[in-house]
Regions:
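Conserved AMP-binding/adenylation subdomain of ANL enzymes
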Residues: 204-221, 228-333, 344
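Conserved ATP-dependent adenylate/AMP-binding module captured primarily in the ANL superfamily
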Residues: 94-124, 206-223, 254-268, 339
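Conserved AMP-binding A3 loop
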Residues: 35-39, 181-207
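Conserved ATP-binding/catalytic segment of the ANL
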Residues: 399-468, 485
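ANL superfamily adenylate-forming
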Residues: 117-177, 283-335
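Structural core segment of the AMP-binding/adenylate-forming
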Residues: 12-13, 55, 82-159, 539
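Conserved pre-ATP/AMP-binding loop-to-beta segment of ANL
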Residues: 20-23, 137, 152, 162-185, ...
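Conserved AMP-binding/adenylate-forming core of the ANL superfamily
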Residues: 2, 25-70, 74-78, 95-100, ...
């Protein structure tokens, strides 16, 4: 019999016993935050699990959750895990056909869907999921006329469970910590996604490592808004919460996230680089709209703090005296943190891609303890985290205690830890390929371990690192990340492997460039029109010229064009986590690549676009190619 502290549902029962009245999870609904205690959490999970058992769900079965971050979806996951099954979260913005592959591959038995939108997707593809027996829905709005026999209300399953009390606890106490708890599907940058099998031990031990290293406390609040299908969300909103007893908080909707963040003021916050850049961009827009004394205070103290952060990075005296820092905290830094909802934040993180130096240093300068972490789905989301005192934009910190890292052939990062996954579901050959003979997991990322500091520097995906025609090393993500540091650039795709020079396709950030265009008095009708304005091309040319000054001569961008649409996951150009699907992009945009290296000045491009409801259309545009300075 496993100790309850060794499994995720066991931790739910422990928390319900040792801290029954403490807040476990909150949900904002109709403008009001509703709090559920750990006793509530335990009861909800127990009743749903007993109901699942009555429906025939048991060990080895798979339960899929689809929707925004909601308490009931979290409870459903832990309930399934307590019965010996595995939870399989799916990206809620996936179109139906994209979702069909994962649901079928996972041998899904039960789906818990947030609302009518997700139920409709599932019903449209249910004939492609032969193992599916039940679809349980949370929000019943719009569901009155639905009579498909596989449908069940969430409450109805719980009611069924109330007559089967005791099943959940018995199953949890008999649970093997090495049983599969979570199947998190990879982003599928090179093909179909693979189901990464993570055990209770993987998740719990990784969460314990994180909680110990970051001093996560029972009193902490974490905002849960990132996609449930991302392993980081499962780690930091579920496993870390269950291990530490801290609270998970679900915003009302993606549209209210900014307001909900300010209201809650969490002590822990995780965002992608794009998320942090959006927050900074919004702050800059607001600052630009102020005048007089307010603007002077903001500019003065911002410049002082950022310069101090730069000096600190160079090992020099910051020059920001105690009085200046105190005044800045009172007039600028504190109010700004309060405005964005991070006044109480003790730990803030970014990961998944490099964050721009200016963005990173801005938040650090304003008193936000922003740090970079590194992990992947196959290692339960954690390998390294930066320390509070030495966080910098160039590394991903030191490997956490108990996690071994070494650099293999082709600079590939190799990892051995309690969080390393059990294998890919039904893919034994693929599993064998990603382990070395001595048991290290091949991350597929190229990196360097700094001999002096012991910190890990991520370079690029190992398979993407190539060479220019003259033999110069070429890392596309390194160039693309520098370009995306610009607030005006949403996405960048660089080409250069085996070529004489580097060229780049740019997708502009419509919001930021649109605001700039309005201030310049430049009219436009839509994204395609805005992107092809001569003034916008010159704006982006200036951003590229600035980046080129930081690059070695051989890999400086020589030619570029602006796309008439942003890259989209619905069009299979990027994954749901915004990773580039390079092979597909190279095929889809082959005419652009040919034009770059055929010395053409323009290209006529016709691309297919997919809408959220699955409908398809086409975008046709004449794109001008420009030489970069």
């Amino acid at each position: 019999m496993a100790a309850r502290e060794e499994t995720l549902p066991g931790l739910v029962l422990r928390n319900a016993q040792v801290r029954p009245d403490k807040p476990a999870i909150r949900e904002k609904d109709l403008g009001i935050w509703r709090t559920y205690s750990w006793a509530d959490y335990g009861r909800q999970v127990r009743e749903f699990a007993d109901g699942l058992a009555a429906l025939g769900f048991g060990a080895g079965d798979k339960l899929v959750v689809i929707g925004d971050n909601r308490p009931r979806l979290y409870w459903a996951q832990v309930a399934a895990q307590g019965l010996g099954g595995a939870a399989v979260p799916v990206y809620q913005d996936s179109i139906a056909q994209e979702m069909a592959f994962v649901l079928a591959d996972a041998d899904t038995k039960v789906i818990v869907a947030e609302d009518q939108e997700q139920v409709d997707k599932v019903l449209s593809i249910q004939d492609q999921i032969p193992t599916l027996e039940y679809v349980v829905y949370d929000d019943d709005r719009g569901m009155l006329g639905y009579d498909d026999p596989i449908l069940r209300r969430f409450e109805a399953v719980q009611e069924l469970g109330r007559g089967k009390a005791g099943v959940f606890e018995k199953s949890v106490d008999a649970l093997d910590p090495d049983a599969i708890a979570l199947m998190s599907y990879t982003s599928g940058t090179t093909g179909n996604p693979k189901g990464v099998m993570l055990s209770h031990r993987n998740m719990v031990e990784t969460a314990k490592t994180f909680c110990a290293g970051e001093d996560v406390r029972e009193s902490d609040d974490f905002l849960s808004y990132l996609p449930m299908a991302w392993v980081g969300e499962s780690m930091y909103s579920v496993a870390v919460s269950l291990v530490s007893g801290c609270s998970t908080n679900c915003p009302e909707s993606p549209e209210t996230l900014e307001r909900d963040l300010r209201e809650l003021g969490p002590t822990g916050f995780l965002a992608s680089p794009r998320g942090w850049e959006t927050i900074l961009s919004q702050l800059q827009v607001k600052a630009n709209d102020t005048t007089g004394v307010k603007r002077w205070f903001y500019d003065t103290f911002r410049n002082a703090a950022v310069n101090a952060e730069l000096a600190k990075a160079e090992g020099k005296s910051s020059g920001l005296g105690g009085l200046m820092r105190l005044l800045g905290e009172f007039f600028v830094y504190g109010p700004v943190r309060d405005q964005i909802g991070l006044r109480r934040a003790r730990w803030c993180y970014t990961g998944g891609a490099p964050l721009g130096h200016d963005t990173f240093r801005f938040f650090r300068a304003f008193g936000v303890n922003l740090k970079q972490l590194y992990g992947s789905t196959e290692v339960s989301g954690l390998v390294s985290v930066q320390g509070d005192a030495n966080a910098n934009p160039d590394t991903s910190g030191k490997p956490c205690p108990g996690i071994e890292v070494k650099i293999g052939d082709n600079s590939e990062i190799l990892v051995k830890s309690p969080g390393v996954f059990k294998g890919y579901y039904k893919r034994e050959d693929a599993t064998r390929e990603v382990f070395t003979d001595d048991g290290y997991f091949r991350t597929g990322d190229a990196g360097v371990l700094d001999e002096k500091s012991g910190e890990l520097l991520i370079i690029d995906r190992a398979k993407d690192v190539g060479k220019m025609a003259d033999g110069t090393a070429y890392a596309p993500q390194f160039i693309e990340s520098k370009l995306k540091y610009s607030a005006y650039i949403s996405e960048a795709v660089s080409f250069g492997d085996g070529r004489d020079f580097v060229s780049v396709m740019i997708a502009i950030d419509q919001s930021t460039v649109g605001n700039w265009a309005e201030k310049q008095g430049i009219p436009y009708t839509n994204y395609a029109d805005l992107s092809q304005k001569p003034e916008v091309r010159e704006l982006i040319a200036g951003e590229i010229a600035r980046v080129n000054t930081t690059l070695p001569d051989a890999v400086r961008v020589k030619r570029f064009l602006l796309l008439a649409k942003d890259l989209d996951a619905d069009d299979a150009e990027v994954t749901r986590t915004r990773k580039l699907r390079r092979a597909y992009i190279a095929e889809r945009y082959a005419p652009v690549i040919d034009a770059f290296y055929g010395n053409q000045g323009e290209v006529n491009l016709r691309t297919e676009v997919t809408f959220e409801d699955g409908r398809r259309s086409h975008v046709e545009a004449r794109l001008l190619i420009q030489d970069a300075a």
